[in-house]
Amino acid sequence: MTPILNVSDMQRSFAWFEKLGWRKCWDWGTPPTFGSVGSGECEIFFCLNGQGGRGGDERRPTFGPGADEAAETGVWISVWVDDVDAVHQRCLEQGIEIAWPPTDMPWGVREMHVRHPDGHVLRIGRGIGQT
């Protein structure tokens, strides 16, 4: 499964993920309207301005004229890492918005949240006690 994030600026999104240590895998179009970043075995697609959006229950278009771009923001994605605190330090150094600092949560996960410029949240975590 590969999540698709609807974004407002492809280059800003590539740059934001590169600050996290991810790499740009590919892009499509001139200028790009679709693309991907990857980290290890994980890949996330980007789509410019709502292509392939959900559309909701009101039979709104998912792409093109009449699409409700505001309804397409706010996706959360969980990303599992080896060291949450190292990722936190990298985010601080790169100026990435920290929405929630590294915290040991009652459900047994040390996690932090970072916010993408379009409002998507990456929930970065590791099971407490995992080696």
Residue positions per predicted region:
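Alpha-helical macromolecular-interaction surfaces
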Residues: 11-12, 86
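Vicinal oxygen chelate
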Residues: 1-4, 19-115, 125-131
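C-terminal catalytic core of tyrosine-transesterase DNA break-rejoin enzymes
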Residues: 118
